[in-house]
Amino acid sequence: FPNEPEYHQAVEEVLNTIEDTYNRNIEFEKSNLIERLCIPDRIFSFRVTWTDDQGNVHTNMGYRIQHNNAIGPYKGGIRFHSSVNLSILKFLAFEQTFKNSLTTLPMGGAKGGSDFNPKGKSNAEIMRFCQAYILELWRNIGPGTDIPAGDIGVGGREVNYMYGMYKKLARENSGTFTGKGLESGGSLIRPEATGYGNVYFLLEMLKTRNIELKGKTV
């Protein structure tokens, strides 16, 4: 992947980690496991056209990387940020496959997004972009197939906009997006969950050294 430095780095790090295990099992080589893991199942790349509040038409690139669904439907967030490109999303989808497998839940790995930068955009502009993004993608996601969520630049508001557009187009709404707002059926305290998880993890690590969290600062 010479033109995809982020993806190349992610793949190299994982392969270095599993090299000894891989070399000890001839079945991995016979099944061409490495190449199958490194090449995503599907890559969707598309133009997203949207209109700003002044009536000017803009074009951004949209993507969805369906990396691997060996153990379940594709699952991974959607990122809106000016730095988004194919290499970054392939890297994120690749790692998402492994992260999801560690949960022991039947979920594959995916990632999507656009180089659209929501910073400085009005609520109406963000809504129109979210709707335009899903207009191009909706046929390739859905329950049992690919369940997106939020990521950088995509919170509950943006997920709600995309979820609403998907419902309108697909006329179906079960199990399509996670990370929705409570008013759209989202999970309670989901925004806090990652932060709480970090604290619980830190507490367990401190216990191994008989250290208390109280009074500690960074």
Give the location of each predicted region.
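Short, mixed-charge aromatic SLiMs
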Residues: 188, 217-218
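N-terminal ligand-binding/catalytic initiation module
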Residues: 1-193, 199-201, 205-208
